[in-house]
């Protein structure tokens, strides 16, 4: 495992990839919630799931945040 990896329940997630991703709705930066395996867009109030180490960046797959 390299220094740029973050462990999730399905294996390492490349931190450089996470830093390069932005919210598809707002183009705002995302934060990583390792416990829930989600990428959080505070600007859009959405949480995008990470499944099998792959971020699912589709609005219809995202969970709305309160």
Swiss-Prot record:
Name of a matching Pfam family: Trm112p
InterPro entries linked: Trm112-like
Cross-referenced SUPFAM superfamilies: Trm112p-like
GO cellular component terms given for this protein: cytosol
Origin: domain of life: Bacteria
Family label: Belongs to the UPF0434 family.
HAMAP family noted in UniProt: UPF0434 (MF_01187)
The protein's name in its UniProt record: UPF0434 protein Jann_0424
Species, as recorded: Jannaschia sp. (strain CCS1)
């Amino acid at each position: 495992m390299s220094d740029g990896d973050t462990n999730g329940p399905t294996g390492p997630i490349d931190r450089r990839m996470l830093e390069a991703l932005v919210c598809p709705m707002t183009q705002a930066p995302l934060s990583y919630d390792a416990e829930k395996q989600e990428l959080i867009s505070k600007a859009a109030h959405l949480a995008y799931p990470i499944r099998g180490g792959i971020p699912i960046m589709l609005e219809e797959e995202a969970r709305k945040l309160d």
